[in-house]
Amino acid sequence: MSERKLFTSESVSEGHPDKIADQISDAILDAILAKDPEAHVAAETCVYTGSVHVFGEISTTAYVDINRVVRDTIAEIGYTEAEYGFSAESVGVHPSLVEQSPDIAQGVNEALEAREGQSDDFNAIGAGDQGLMFGFAIDETPELMPLPISLSHQLVRRLATLRKSGEISYLRPDAKSQVTVEYDEHDKPVRVDTVVISTQHDPEVSNDQIRQDMIEQVIKAVIPAHYLDEKTRFLINPTGRFVIGGPQGDSGLTGRKIIVDTYGGYARHGGGAFSGKDATKVDRSASYAARYIAKNLVAAGLASKAEVQLAYAIGVAQPVSVRVDTFGTSTVSESILEAAVRQVFDLRPAGIIKMLDLKRPIYRQTAAYGHMGRTDIDLPWEQLDKVSPLTEAVAALSEGA
């Protein structure tokens, strides 16, 4: 009998409390970058019934109406009714943003390499903190993402589309999804074992109606039919009722959905959150660079699965380590892949910022439904423009080995 394994990932909607916080933090970041691309921003948000607190550190010449940004973001998500216990116009907004610490700023604004006399312009910016970051890609889906997180994101995005269009009028903004995929003995996905959807709803709708709509209009519209069979389980609002939701039901904080933001637990995570941080924070920019590297490695056919780890020291431009793990799927040695990565990609913070053009206000759109593998928006770290340079570098290094 062949050995089969299950793997599960989850996603949450834009109306989930933690995702509201992420979107507010990134909306503030975008508003500042639109006026001051050189700004340093670390904006955190806390949401709960009737209140939003925004706090953190910024260095900018721009003036931004934080109150307006917060309210507009909440309205765009869909919290516009007082009965939700959290609405754009009635919520209390409490900003508390201060100047970035000069001790941190001196290392970011002038890297160790620059202080030691190295004149390269890309040595000017040091990493905003120490830390380790991971990027991942796998050939399970066209976007080179693990199937469980890809399907989970698609389910909650479909829910949001049906809610905002009015096609399912009883839906409210808060929702979660979870997909369990069965893999064969070769680690290839063969079927979906379980789908969980919990969606906030108006009080008068029946559970039978919700179940029917979720299966027919959401699950079957998203998950390819060949992954579904008579044994697939559908668990729809398994508590039996989900009227109270959003910040009225749970408080939310920026940075609490880092696994949803990345690979659904299929790959490792360095622990740093993304939202509210400008690109000098390598928690964000180096994670994007690592995904960029991994995706191009897999797209080039150099591996069917690739995980890239980058690590940095605060105030130092060059990464302290670069590691590529292909889990035995690479066509050449991993040492050659690592050498090729170092040749093709400039992994200093300034190099990443230039390579991916990260001083633009592009972050609000990433703050729900995943930062990686997006097919609905155009993100620079999802481009495949490094396939040829990587292939050429690997060929040259292999000849010289």
Swiss-Prot record:
EC number: 2.5.1.6
Pathway assignment: Amino-acid biosynthesis; S-adenosyl-L-methionine biosynthesis; S-adenosyl-L-methionine from L-methionine: step 1/1
Cofactor comment text: Binds 2 divalent ions per subunit.
Sequence segments annotated as region (Flexible loop): 100-110
Origin: domain of life: Bacteria
Annotated ATP binding sites: 16, 174-176, 241-242, 250, 256-257, 273, 277
Pfam families found in the cross-reference section: S-AdoMet_synt_C, S-AdoMet_synt_M, S-AdoMet_synt_N
Residues involved in L-methionine binding: 57, 100, 250, 281
GO molecular function, a single term: ATP binding
Reaction catalysed by this enzyme: L-methionine + ATP + H2O = S-adenosyl-L-methionine + phosphate + diphosphate
This protein's record includes keyword Translocase: no
Cofactor(s) listed: Mg(2+); K(+)
A single GO cellular-component term on record: cytoplasm
Residues binding Mg(2+), per UniProt: 18
Subunit description: Homotetramer; dimer of dimers.
NCBIfam families: metK (TIGR01034)
Family statement drawn from the similarity comment of this UniProt entry: Belongs to the AdoMet synthase family.
Protein name per its UniProtKB record: S-adenosylmethionine synthase
Gene encoding the protein: metK
